[in-house]
Amino acid sequence: MPLAQLKEPWPLMELVPLDPENGQASGEEAGLQPSKDEGILKEISITHHVKAGSEKADPSHFELLKVLGQGSFGKVFLVRKVTRPDNGHLYAMKVLKKATLKVRDRVRTKMERDILADVNHPFVVKLHYAFQTEGKLYLILDFLRGGDLFTRLSKEVMFTEEDVKFYLAELALGLDHLHSLGIIYRDLKPENILLDEEGHIKLTDFGLSKEAIDHEKKAYSFCGTVEYMAPEVVNRQGHTHSADWWSYGVLMFEMLTGSLPFQGKDRKETMTLILKAKLGMPQFLSTEAQSLLRALFKRNPANRLGSGPDGAEEIKRHIFYSTIDWNKLYRREIKPPFKPAVAQPDDTFYFDTEFTSRTPRDSPGIPPSAGAHQLFRGFSFVATGLMEDDSKPRATQAPLHSVVQQLHGKNLVFSDGYIVKETIGVGSYSVCKRCVHKATNMEYAVKVIDKSKRDPSEEIEILLRYGQHPNIITLKDVYDDSKHVYLVTELMRGGELLDKILRQKFFSEREASFVLYTISKTVEYLHSQGVVHRDLKPSNILYVDESGNPECLRICDFGFAKQLRAENGLLMTPCYTANFVAPEVLKRQGYDEGCDIWSLGVLLYTMLAGYTPFANGPSDTPEEILTRISSGKFTLSGGNWNTVSETAKDLVSKMLHVDPHQRLTAKQVLQHPWITQKDKLPQSQLSHQDLQLVKGGMAATYSALSSSKPTPQLKPIESSILAQRRVRKLPSTTL
């Protein structure tokens, strides 16, 4: 976005002449003293410790599942451990060929392993194993399912300053920890900040990190991504941990504005801009954000915030972070603004399909030079926690088999993995069938969606992001054959909610309260995340088993569901929604939420009365039903209503209010006495009409509603202007 150009906001440093060949500052001009041996192997001091008696790992201990990424140094695979004590656990495996690494790159790799082995912090990726073969080096790291911050920043979400503050605060704690160990990160950029499944950050890729080596604790290497480089890194005058705080400022600027502060047409021009350009401060930023940026963008590193004796404490004390509770943040008790859409432990939907579509293959390494193994001597490492008593309970591990596949770029077809059985249900644009997974003989349901009639991307994303909720149907697998999309979900063996209730010989008001509580709690969770279902008819609320326990209810069929988005198609965080959304957008969102509550009101009425509120019989026309709905006319007397509690009638009336903006919210439903005091409700039996009459009336009600309004067609988020502008292509190399 265009930035308002102001007068010179930051002081300038004297510009160091650039080498015309490569755009880099020459060593002598930059104050870098040449070394007679070029300092290649002496660039860092490598220290190494391995726990005595620990069992070493090797490549045979890991099953290759998918390619997650590929860069100049090697590939990253998703792997599953197949040996004890952590068999079944998923990791990211970074594989590097010794023969293709230059000496300097080998030092970087050894350095990355040493740094990761020494660092244990909630916001830094954890190293679990490190080992080598004759031709390759292996780093076994946390598998972080949320992908990298760059993908989130560029393709999906509208962040506010409060949202950015969360990520920057976690990042400050991670950097502070590295600095306390004498480590300069030097490659801070969104691509190296990963998200876990909850949305917390993890710093990764330590190939350019460096432990300070001279008496002034300065490093001199020219490294990092040029747009994020500090001036002292560009001119090679020697840099300390203060260089990371400049990069931190660049990241903050990019997240707040969507653009980089210094970016030329090529590398040389970018470095020139970093050293001498005037930059206008965007006036739409808060004064606190502007103040922090000015304090970080000091070209003299000695004057930069964070460079003083207190280090990161200077950053943490800045007024921009006045609302952050740093202790709660460190304990991961502050809720992230964005939750990645990942469901199963080995989902890789958020990794570039250029890589995840490839067959994972760890090719034999070419034997390196004779000295290579000596250079990497002592490379093996086993995380301490893995050697503890295996009898102790551990966190839930991934199952030994996986049915989750990648959505795009596969050469797989649904019938390769599943046997299709009978039809369960038919809709206007999809059909649902029972299916059996061939490898495990497990039963599932598959929803086959005709892509020419509906774009399923929103439904898939919502199920991935929120399907972990205990009362939302779980998405197990996704296939795409260009004409149809196949959504494999858990099988609802207990059938529809109304079928179960109306077939019971005994159903009471108290039981109805427990049912509504479970469903309302789930709807309140969705609404709090900016998601509206918009099709909460009873046939989309099913039991996962035949127990009839309300906790076994699942909300299904998110085909009409929506996530709250900005005009450019990007998702809005709750903070963004609360502060920056136009009233008409909020009004529409409130209307959709009101429709969900109305549907729950219809369900509640039917459970209590034994018949539907607006359809009186098979002879009703859609026009008659719509007239009753629009006038808000329904009866609360006679039949079961003579014995139903007054609090129940009050709740029904407030949920079925004719004005959607005057209906109770899901949160208010949960706070209603009929829900909070359910144990005091009557347990007398409620009578009901014939099951088919009730279901017929319900079907007629929703049929009349659907015929009265057109269904909006939602476009995929990839079609948004901002998403298209920020699409990038990662470099491809062969390992």
UniProtKB/Swiss-Prot annotation:
Molecular function GO terms recorded: ATP binding; DNA-binding transcription factor binding; kinase activity; magnesium ion binding; protein serine kinase activity; protein serine/threonine kinase activity; protein serine/threonine/tyrosine kinase activity; ribosomal protein S6 kinase activity
Activity control mechanisms: Upon extracellular signal or mitogen stimulation, phosphorylated at Thr-573 in the C-terminal kinase domain (CTKD) by MAPK1/ERK2 and MAPK3/ERK1. The activated CTKD then autophosphorylates Ser-380, allowing binding of PDPK1, which in turn phosphorylates Ser-221 in the N-terminal kinase domain (NTDK) leading to the full activation of the protein and subsequent phosphorylation of the substrates by the NTKD.
Needed cofactors: Mg(2+)
PTM remark: Activated by phosphorylation at Ser-221 by PDPK1. Autophosphorylated on Ser-380, as part of the activation process. May be phosphorylated at Thr-359 and Ser-363 by MAPK1/ERK2 and MAPK3/ERK1.
Gene3D superfamilies: Phosphorylase Kinase, domain 1, Transferase(Phosphotransferase) domain 1
Keywords: ATP-binding, Cytoplasm, Kinase, Nucleotide-binding, Nucleus, Phosphoprotein, Repeat, Serine/threonine-protein kinase, Transferase
PROSITE patterns noted in UniProt: AGC_KINASE_CTER (PS51285), PROTEIN_KINASE_ATP (PS00107), PROTEIN_KINASE_DOM (PS50011), PROTEIN_KINASE_ST (PS00108)
Domain AGC-kinase C-terminal: 322-391
Modified residues (Phosphothreonine): T359, T573
Chief site of localization: nucleus
GO-annotated cellular components: cytoplasm; cytosol; glutamatergic synapse; nucleoplasm; postsynaptic density; spindle; synapse
Function: Serine/threonine-protein kinase that acts downstream of ERK (MAPK1/ERK2 and MAPK3/ERK1) signaling and mediates mitogenic and stress-induced activation of the transcription factors CREB1, ETV1/ER81 and NR4A1/NUR77, regulates translation through RPS6 and EIF4B phosphorylation, and mediates cellular proliferation, survival, and differentiation by modulating mTOR signaling and repressing pro-apoptotic function of BAD and DAPK1. In fibroblast, is required for EGF-stimulated phosphorylation of CREB1, which results in the subsequent transcriptional activation of several immediate-early genes.
PANTHER family named among the record's database cross-references: RIBOSOMAL PROTEIN S6 KINASE
Subunit description: Forms a complex with either MAPK1/ERK2 or MAPK3/ERK1 in quiescent cells. Transiently dissociates following mitogenic stimulation. Interacts with ETV1/ER81 and FGFR1.
Protein name, entry field: Ribosomal protein S6 kinase alpha-1
Provenance organism: Rattus norvegicus
Gene name linked to the record: Rps6ka1
